[in-house]
Swiss-Prot record:
It comes from Drosophila simulans (Fruit fly). PROSITE patterns: CH (PS50021). Involved in endocytic trafficking by stabilizing organelles of the endocytic pathway. Probably acts as a cytoskeletal linker protein required to tether endosome vesicles to the cytoskeleton. Involved in modulation of endocytosis at stages required for down-regulation of membrane proteins that control synapse size. Not involved in synaptic vesicle recycling. Required in R7 cells for boss endocytosis into multivesicular bodies (MVBs). Has a role in regulating adult longevity. The gene is hook. It is found in: Cytoplasm, Cytoskeleton; Endosome; Synapse. The coiled coil domain mediates homodimerization. Keywords: Coiled coil, Cytoplasm, Cytoskeleton, Developmental protein, Endocytosis, Endosome, Microtubule, Synapse. This is Protein hook.
Length: 679
């Protein structure tokens, strides 16, 4: 099918093969490097395409290097355009420039055709154009017609007037020898017959004139002899003309007449010779014309036979067009069938993918359900851990506080011991003076001071009461959600810390009041230390409060993120389910368009399957997969049956020798249901 498309290219290539070039120029690959084209241009116009310019064209080591080809072709086309604009005064603005990259890379025939068209224009417009035109005239008529069409397309783009504008017309006149040959032969034969008739008439007239001149010459000779015999001659008027002697008037006149007659005789003889030569030439022309007429008669007979063959070929061409149209329709139908097959395959693959995605989404949903339970467990564990942490922290604070109290008591006891030792020394000195009553009073006083220091503080009771309330509140709020519990726990911890801070402040105040009654210096140092410790505890509690708040916010963010992910997964599952249903509906429509019988069977099977699925929704995963595989296999069976039916139709259509309408009237062969069931 590529030859009719590039008919002009092959005609131009046949003309280019007639040139005597050193470089190979037989096919498109040899022309794609531009070497043969450059040599041809140098041969056409060596004054414009000089040898120095030709040496710039790289002939060796080009091979398959398309960049070197591209550079050669650029040089050739630029020089050709310069030659057209500067030398021929042509404007090629309307002529589409050939794509050199496609020629260099792919040897494109369409672009080579335009490049050869430009080279042809250089050939028929150069100084030696007549020789190249005669070479073109020696080619076949079909090639001449294509070359003439190429020149006409090239001249249609010319905008400046040039004296070589009639080249295409001369080629067109020389190439019109097809069906008009018979008329030309008839006209030439009539013209030659008319010429022969006119030459024969001229010959007869000249022969008559020759005989008349000969008779007149004979009469003159007789008259001259008679006049020489008689001395005197009487004229027409009766007057004597005198003797014919040399020097006389009569003699001179007769002499003059004789000279005139001789000149006329010579002229008549020259004319006779000319006529004889013309007659011989006319005879030879007549023979040539007769031979030409015979040749033309033979050519007219050949033309008639060729006309008959053309008519036969025309009829066969019409039949071929009809067959090609039918073939195109069949090809389109086959392409549509292949497209439908591809679409069905794609839909099957998509349905399988959707089934896999649905299974994966189900697994993800189950996994997320498990993770949901785990998250709830983790929430409960976090709450328990927070409760334990609060209990341990409160215990730690209590122990630290008790430790500090015990240390203070120990210091107080040590001081009391020192004072007692001093008093003992004093009492030993005054043992003689003071008796047992004083000793008992002093011991009672010391016992009261010690008992006062060892009494439990009110803050410990308040802390115990607050812890009990905290535990009761935690137990009462155990039924709320995880986030609310976390927030409540954080708030409770804040309240506990605030209450502890309050109690610490109250204790500081109580201790400050107690310090006023005891030794001020020692109490201030002890209470200063306790105040510092309580401030540090306050800072630690505030830090713990902030950490608890941040942990609660982070846990809340994680829970919200997990909930959003779960909702997004559920939406994706719904979207993929809808897409799967749409694809199933499209597959049903395609199968209905292919064969409604299979489609009805498929609808019934799909309805049954859907009813079974509705009844048995909580089926295991493997049974669902088996049912989906069975439905896809049933779809594939329907497609295969339809394909076999179409193949049998095509085989019947291609094998039978009937007409297209007769084949269309026949009923399509149908396969039995038993054959389909056996498959």
């Amino acid at each position: 099918m590529s030859a009719p498309k590039n008919e002009m290219y092959y005609s131009l290539l046949e003309w280019f093969k007639t040139l005597n070039l050193n470089a190979p120029h037989a096919d498109a690959e040899s022309l794609a490097d531009g070497v043969a084209l450059a040599q041809a241009l140098n041969q056409f116009a060596p004054e414009s395409f000089t040898d120095a310019w030709l040496s710039k064209i790289k002939a060796s080591a080009v091979g398959s290097n398309w960049r070197l080809r591209m550079s050669n072709l650029k040089k050739v086309t630029q020089s050709v355009y310069d030659y057209y604009s500067d030398v021929l005064n042509y404007s090629l603005s309307d002529f589409s420039k050939p794509d050199l990259q496609r020629i260099a890379e792919k040897c494109d025939l369409g672009e080579l055709e335009r490049l050869l068209q430009l080279v042809l224009g250089c050939a028929v417009n150069c100084a030696e154009k007549q020789s190249y035109i005669t070479e073109i005239m020696c080619l076949e008529e079909e090639l001449q017609a294509n070359i003439m069409r190429a020149l006409q397309e090239l001249e249609a783009t010319r905008q400046a007037s040039t004296p070589e504008g009639g080249v295409a017309s001369s080629l067109s006149r020389g190439s019109r020898t097809g069906l008009l040959d018979s008329k030309a032969v008839q006209e030439d034969r009539d013209a030659l017959a008319q010429k022969c008739f006119e030459t024969e008439k001229k010959m007869l007239l000249l022969i008559d004139e020759k005989t008349n001149l000969q008779q007149e010459l004979h009469k003159l000779q007789q008259e001259f002899a008679r006049l020489e015999q008689h001395s005197t001659v009487i004229g027409d008027d009766g007057v004597s003309l005198g003797p014919v002697q040399t020097g006389s008037v009569r003699y001179n006149e007769l002499r003059r007449q004789l000279d005139l007659l001789k000149e006329e005789l010579l002229q008549s003889e020259g004319a006779r010779e000319d006529l004889k030569i013309k007659a011989q030439q006319q005879d030879t022309d007549l023979l040539h014309m007769q031979m030409r007429i015979e040749e033309l008669m033979k050519s007219s007979a050949e033309v008639t036979t060729l006309k008959d063959e053309v008519d036969v070929l025309r009829e066969s061409n019409d039949k071929l067009k009809i067959c090609e149209a039918q073939l195109d329709t069949y090809k389109k139908k086959l392409e549509d069938y292949n497209d439908l097959k591809k679409q069905v395959k794609i839909l099957e693959e998509r349905s399988a993918d959707y089934v896999q995605q649905n299974a994966q989404f189900e697994e993800d949903a189950k996994r997320y359900a498990n993770t949901k339970g785990q998250v709830e467990l983790f929430k409960k564990e976090i709450q328990d851990l927070h409760a334990k942490l609060d209990a341990e922290s409160s215990k730690n604070v209590k122990l630290e506080f008790d430790n500090k109290n015990l240390e203070g008591k120990n210091l107080a006891l040590q001081r009391a011991k020192d004072s007692l030792l001093k008093e003992r020394d004093n009492l030993r000195e005054a043992v003689d003076e003071l008796k047992c009553g004083q000793l008992s009073s002093s011991t009672a006083l010391t016992g009261t001071t010690v008992s006062r220091e060892l009494q439990p503080s009110a803050t410990v009771e308040k802390l115990q009461r607050l812890e009990a309330e905290n535990k009761a509140l935690r137990e009462g709020q155990g039924g709320q959600t995880a986030l609310a519990q976390l927030l409540d726990d954080a708030n409770k911890r804040c309240e506990n810390l605030r209450e502890q801070l309050k109690t610490a402040n109250e204790r500081i105040l109580s201790l400050s009041h107690a310090s006023q009654s005891d030794d001020p210096i020692l109490k201030e140092s002890e209470f200063g230390k306790q105040i510092k410790q309580l401030m540090e505890l306050n800072e630690q509690k505030t830090l713990q409060l902030e950490e608890a708040v941040t942990q609660s916010t982070s846990l809340q963010c994680k829970v919200t993120q997990l909930e959003t992910n779960l909702s997004a997964r559920e939406q994706e599952i719904l979207v993929y389910d809808a897409k799967y249903r749409k694809c199933v509906e499209k597959a049903k429509e395609v199968i209905k368009s292919i064969d409604p019988r299979i489609a009805s069977a498929l609808d019934a099977s799909v309805l049954e399957k859907s009813a079974d699925l509705v009844e048995e929704e909580p089926k295991p995963k493997m049974s669902v997969m088996e049912e989906q595989l069975m439905t896809s296999a049933f779809y594939r069976l329907g497609v295969n049956a339809q394909r076999d039916a179409i193949d049998s139709k095509l085989a019947i259509l291609m094998g039978s020798g009937q007409t297209f309408l007769a084949r269309q009237r026949q009923s399509a062969p149908r396969k039995s249901l038993s054959a389909m069931k056996s498959k």
